């Protein structure tokens, strides 16, 4: 089959690092090509070379059979290559239709914007995606999942021949994911080629026809998905067998450290639970169940309307994240790029940002040598892959950014560490490293709350699991009681903790 798009022998180097070496990718009409590899394998760099953001150092790009070089995203878009980025690229203050047709609005014969046509065309695109809202709604009023769907509608509006989807389901619910897959199947029937970049094995085996594997910037293999198993694909990605994906540390927890009684706040209704020293408490539930809201009320980012929180026997009141930090409660956000990291700052600055009081003299000046030593120790301990601590953190892979975010939380020497989706957007190899770090913290007696949408992760890592449903606690299970079935039953409200007991 003739490929719509072919990249062969692509090289790309940056100061101190060779990002791509002999990389290759083919995209075929009417087929979905998965592009997989650990974070830092070169997937994002390859997409930037393809769309003209980066100039390739060597190699060829064939588009519809002709050798081509795109000068930037606009030229690749106009040629018929659409890309849906992992980071949403929308303007919250504009309507959905205005976002979709930004810069190419429909104009009537008097030179004025034809709003009626524009909204009608945008509504058609939303209907194609089976979405329940109209295009006159402000993007800022949508959930992250719905905003992702608007991104997809925007790319569809260009009638692209090849569509690149970078982690498209990262923020989508199961229903939204099913809508996306329905659209992908429709696009295949229309003869479009799709590049599907994802870490989610289940999705790759469900929706993709072929898979290209990158490792350390090199092309490893192109295979038909049907010829592979999950284990064989992971082995190609990491270059080794992953024996035990969730390395649970079997160590009995200590005394109660945190006690939460009848906690209420935005999206949180009368929640009570305990957390022990050296315990990993998993928090499960569907998207919108109130898991993140519960954590934000707990550490002070959302207002607490009633209830009590006791830490080591003393009542704590957290009216702001600073109060949470001061009391030894650290929260690592699910959205590290919005809430967690300052992308323009260096690895060192990001890591030490909340712990500067430990490196400050009485007069307020910094003890730079102490700060550098601490950052250097954490980089080594966490195996953060970076050319230096002065590197801008935005240039690191997702897994390495996440390690820096966790290290920053630990620098403040917390008693309770809340990890909200700690492995979202992180590849299989880096996930295992993060799990091993979590176990290390547990062994040191740290109390950990692990919030995750990935049930195998919650089941594999937790000592005890609580489940949220519509702002309430709908279940609490020991490690032995917990299965995917009971967690899902509690998550949809079919089972409550009283039934279980």
Curated annotation (Swiss-Prot):
Q: Name one GO molecular function term.
A: ATP binding
Its UniProt entry gives the catalysed reaction(s) as: D-ribose(out) + ATP + H2O = D-ribose(in) + ADP + phosphate + H(+)
> Per its UniProt entry, which superkingdom is the organism in?
Bacteria
Q: Where does ATP bind?
A: 37-44
Q: Where in the cell is it found?
A: Cell inner membrane
Q: Which UniProt keywords apply?
A: ATP-binding, Cell inner membrane, Cell membrane, Membrane, Nucleotide-binding, Repeat, Sugar transport, Translocase, Transport
**Is Calcium there in the keyword field?**
no
* PROSITE patterns tied to this protein: ABC_TRANSPORTER_1 (PS00211), ABC_TRANSPORTER_2 (PS50893), RBSA (PS51254)
Subunit structure, briefly? Answer: The complex is composed of an ATP-binding protein (RbsA), two transmembrane proteins (RbsC) and a solute-binding protein (RbsB).
Q: What is this protein called?
A: Ribose import ATP-binding protein RbsA
**Name of encoding gene:** rbsA
